[in-house]
């Protein structure tokens, strides 16, 4: 689990996302509260439930990007799902309980990686011995007379192996043969049953080994994984993963506005209000049956987000509104924000294009007025047509760089300066003509 302070979390998000300080502060506090809760006494810890968040804002302002970056910072089981992928129980489509099953799978993977790190040294030693055994088979006769000589030779080869001198040499080793995969086609909504059937068939076959010939470098990696998996206790792994999900799990529900009931619709709405009703027990706290064991959702943090352009938060059913107590509104982006997005974040769009063209030997220089013009063009198109936020910059930049990208391989060693005049020549007609903007930008 991350032990970063709220200020450190916001600072880290600032290097990738421009503006939206209120949203950053809310998710930073929520993430830090996960750590604070774990410092409490066990009886009080059970009573402290997470304060779920609802992020509201137009498309392309950073809601999903905040989730992506948060996943890397959290160091905890994290899953991002689209609310529109689910339907009410009993209908064709995914059930919402699949969210928790996927989150548990994520925790299993995370826990396994942590346990492999802990036993990596022992696994490396065991893998090294197996490679040396393959290189220097033990003599069948006169074992006592050759013992000292064999040991000395083994140490010489061990030194060469560690220095990488034997990386390209091929050896034959016995490795665990992968279990025969059995693909079972299932209708939507029955993924859990399919997974359990596949696991059952895979566990029925004995773990046979297979002799393979490969370079030592490749064999060493394979043997480390094999030896590490032998050192891991699978039951302990499942227990730790379930504990991790229950205490630190985070679910990001994107596009939650798309499951709001529309005023004009009538009859059963299985992919809208039905999904909201099914989400209620998950968010409130229930027990979900997964193939790894029972998972309680009482302390899982839910962060929901939506543009709410065709609906409003009050269109959610009241019970779900009450379970998302923290509301954060994200601001629409201005031309000034677009300029900052082009230059300030780590691996910004301008940096990416400079690096891409650099692979062809072409040097690109963006001037201050050139960046201003790009930002202004993107903002104008957003104002005149659909406002898709920062995503418009990708479209505008791709259009701007199209000619240069096509001819770059023939212009090695050249220097191109992208200033206001260059931007005007490339984009002016498209920006001014609303019909062209609507279809091309």
From Swiss-Prot:
ATP binds at residues 18, 60-65, 254, 319, 391. GO terms for cellular component: HslUV protease complex. InterPro entries: AAA+_ATPase (IPR003593), ATP-dep_Clp_protease_ClpX (IPR050052), ATPase_AAA_core (IPR003959), Clp_ATPase_C (IPR019489), HslU (IPR004491), P-loop_NTPase (IPR027417). Transmembrane segments: none annotated. Keywords: ATP-binding, Chaperone, Cytoplasm, Nucleotide-binding, Stress response. It comes from the Bacteria. GO terms for molecular function: ATP binding; ATP hydrolysis activity; peptidase activity; proteasome-activating activity. A double ring-shaped homohexamer of HslV is capped on each side by a ring-shaped HslU homohexamer. The assembly of the HslU/HslV complex is dependent on binding of ATP. This is ATP-dependent protease ATPase subunit HslU. It comes from Shewanella halifaxensis (strain HAW-EB4). The gene is hslU.
């Amino acid at each position: 689990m991350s032990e970063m302070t709220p200020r450190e979390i916001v600072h880290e998000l600032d290097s990738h996302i421009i503006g939206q300080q209120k949203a950053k502060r809310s998710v930073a506090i929520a993430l830090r509260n996960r750590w604070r809760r774990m410092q409490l006494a066990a009886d009080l810890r059970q009573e402290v439930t997470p304060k779920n968040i609802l992020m509201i804002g137009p498309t392309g302002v950073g809601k999903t990007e905040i989730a992506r970056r948060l996943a890397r910072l959290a160091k905890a089981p994290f899953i991002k799902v689209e609310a529109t992928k689910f339907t009410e129980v009993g209908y064709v489509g995914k059930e919402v309980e699949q969210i928790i099953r996927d989150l548990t799978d994520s925790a299993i993977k995370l826990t396994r990686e942590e346990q492999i790190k802990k036993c990596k040294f022992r696994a490396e030693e065991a893998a090294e011995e197996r490679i040396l055994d393959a290189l220097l088979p033990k003599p069948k006769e006169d074992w006592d007379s050759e013992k000292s000589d064999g040991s000395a030779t083994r140490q010489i080869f061990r030194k060469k192996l560690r220095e990488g001198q034997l990386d390209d040499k091929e050896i034959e080793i016995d490795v665990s043969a992968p279990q025969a995969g059995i693909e079972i086609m299932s209708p939507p909504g029955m993924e859990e049953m399919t997974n359990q059937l596949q696991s059952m068939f895979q566990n029925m076959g004995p773990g046979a080994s297979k002799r393979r010939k490969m370079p030592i470098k490749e064999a060493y990696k394979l043997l480390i994984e094999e030896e590490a998996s032998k050192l891991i206790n699978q039951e302990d792994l499942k227990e730790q993963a379930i504990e991790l999900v229950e205490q630190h799990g985070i679910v990001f529900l994107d596009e939650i506005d798309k499951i709001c009931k529309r005023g004009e619709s009538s009859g059963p709405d299985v992919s809208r209000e039905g999904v909201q009703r099914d989400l209620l027990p998950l968010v409130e706290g229930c027990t979900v049956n997964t193939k790894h064991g029972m998972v309680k959702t009482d302390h899982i943090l839910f962060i929901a987000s939506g543009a709410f352009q065709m609906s409003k938060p009050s269109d959610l059913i009241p019970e779900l509104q009450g379970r998302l107590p923290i509301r954060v509104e994200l601001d629409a982006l201005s031309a000034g924000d677009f300029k900052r997005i082009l230059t300030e974040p780590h691996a910004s769009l301008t940096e990416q294009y400079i690096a891409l063209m650099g692979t062809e030997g072409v040097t690109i220089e963006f001037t201050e007025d050139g960046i201003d013009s790009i930002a202004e063009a993107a903002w104008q198109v957003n104002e005149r047509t659909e406002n898709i936020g920062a995503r418009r910059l990708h479209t505008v930049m791709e259009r701007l760089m199209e000619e240069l990208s096509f001819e770059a391989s023939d212009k090695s060693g050249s220097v191109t300066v992208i200033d206001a005049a260059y931007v005007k020549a490339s984009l002016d007609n498209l920006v001014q003509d609303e019909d062209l903007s609507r279809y091309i930008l």
